[in-house]
């Protein structure tokens, strides 16, 4: 009876958290939406009005279909519900079409598909180590994790204000992770394969999946020292995984292969002509690289080491542009970013293979793959930081060191999303939601690990507190100075570079913990 009552109570608090955040999402329906709103409306129109043979060729709008086929079919399914709201939104020639019914349909399509994310969070909570439990419900790791995921600030503003479907996609990722924790490897692999054909950004974490499944599922045993026992290789298991990948890929890409359109599909999915950085530099290594190039350019001009006529005008005046031309440092090619990304990922993958630490080792590798790709990838969007923040939430409630990395990563990464919402009415909303989430995250994790050393040292504390003055400077001071006209890019530049420092630090610290953890494990066994 006691166990039954406890389970019921547990179900009640989780349902209350999910219902509460759903109501908040409904309140955000009238807020600002970005051009992504028109992007997805146009995709509804394309998939509804045209035969499949024209989906990846249609270019009436500049917002062409550039997601994998499963997402196109997802839009197709939504379009058959959308027609009951407003048929005009499905007209390809109605560019930038907007109506109150279109707004309601698209907003609620995001809210309702978030049900998958809610279910995935519930499943992830079952995978949390229950050794560290508090007396009160609010001190329990499962409760804290539920809040960190369900009420994630980044998902709220990116999906339910800016407008995207990251919750639904992140739900598939988290559910796949949960299935691997539960040793339901085939289900986990299937979910991830489907996810790859919904949004190809998840290719970034595919190495973690591939190595983990091969090492921990296809090889059924290890030697006493932890190394792989080659004789334990299971042909049946590797064949089953191969069949999953093949069948899902065939279902997704098969129709376009039959139409001889695969090159066209891939050209839409991987548009390398876009340039190294997005219009607003994602806070990664290349933001620091670009900023250093600007500093060196200014110094070179002051010392008359550079010829002003030879400096690309866009790089020194308009600031944050897509096709960034370097002045002093070497320009970066897509191949260079790919090589840097692979080099950054390899150590974590090697640790996963040679010193496997179960599902948690896989999860650390996944986060490092996501972060490494964010740090060094080509044309990275700032929103891609959520790919690392959400899985890192699972680790944050189990170890103090991981909690520190999560708090620095989440606080810095979430703040870097502020430029997405640049309209005045949304300013108090984003500041309030960010403060609430950040204060809760820090206070709850500090309480959870109160018996251990402080989560932050003085340097980390000063850095995080520095986000306050940065926001005041960018939002309330610089816009009222003469710099606004002369250097309009300065607020974005400061935000990008400052946040890049924090994210780089979090990535470095997490990597150090993984590498030193492997060394400690090896020492203990010897």
UniProtKB/Swiss-Prot annotation:
GO MF term list: dolichyl pyrophosphate Glc1Man9GlcNAc2 alpha-1,3-glucosyltransferase activity
Q: Which UniProt keywords apply?
A: Endoplasmic reticulum, Glycosyltransferase, Membrane, Transferase, Transmembrane, Transmembrane helix
| Entry GO terms, CC | endoplasmic reticulum membrane
Gene from which this protein is expressed: Alg8
Protein species of origin: Mus musculus
EC assignment = 2.4.1.265
Q: Might you name a Gene Ontology BP term for this protein?
A: dolichol-linked oligosaccharide biosynthetic process
- Predominant location: endoplasmic reticulum
Q: What's this chain's function?
A: Dolichyl pyrophosphate Glc1Man9GlcNAc2 alpha-1,3-glucosyltransferase that operates in the biosynthetic pathway of dolichol-linked oligosaccharides, the glycan precursors employed in protein asparagine (N)-glycosylation. The assembly of dolichol-linked oligosaccharides begins on the cytosolic side of the endoplasmic reticulum membrane and finishes in its lumen. The sequential addition of sugars to dolichol pyrophosphate produces dolichol-linked oligosaccharides containing fourteen sugars, including two GlcNAcs, nine mannoses and three glucoses.
Where does the protein end up? Endoplasmic reticulum membrane
Membrane topology listed for this record: Multi-pass membrane protein
Annotated catalysed reactions = an alpha-D-Glc-(1->3)-alpha-D-Man-(1->2)-alpha-D-Man-(1->2)-alpha-D-Man-(1->3)-[alpha-D-Man-(1->2)-alpha-D-Man-(1->3)-[alpha-D-Man-(1->2)-alpha-D-Man-(1->6)]-alpha-D-Man-(1->6)]-beta-D-Man-(1->4)-beta-D-GlcNAc-(1->4)-alpha-D-GlcNAc-diphospho-di-trans,poly-cis-dolichol + a di-trans,poly-cis-dolichyl beta-D-glucosyl phosphate = an alpha-D-Glc-(1->3)-alpha-D-Glc-(1->3)-alpha-D-Man-(1->2)-alpha-D-Man-(1->2)-alpha-D-Man-(1->3)-[alpha-D-Man-(1->2)-alpha-D-Man-(1->3)-[alpha-D-Man-(1->2)-alpha-D-Man-(1->6)]-alpha-D-Man-(1->6)]-beta-D-Man-(1->4)-beta-D-GlcNAc-(1->4)-alpha-D-GlcNAc-diphospho-di-trans,poly-cis-dolichol + a di-trans,poly-cis-dolichyl phosphate + H(+)
Transmembrane intervals:
9-29, 108-128, 143-163, 188-208, 238-258, 334-354, 361-380, 400-422, 427-449, 461-481, 487-507
Q: Which family does it belong to?
A: Belongs to the ALG6/ALG8 glucosyltransferase family.
Instruction: Provide the taxonomic classification.
Output: Eukaryota, Metazoa, Chordata, Craniata, Vertebrata
Q: Record keywords: Transmembrane helix included?
A: yes
This protein is called what?
Dolichyl pyrophosphate Glc1Man9GlcNAc2 alpha-1,3-glucosyltransferase
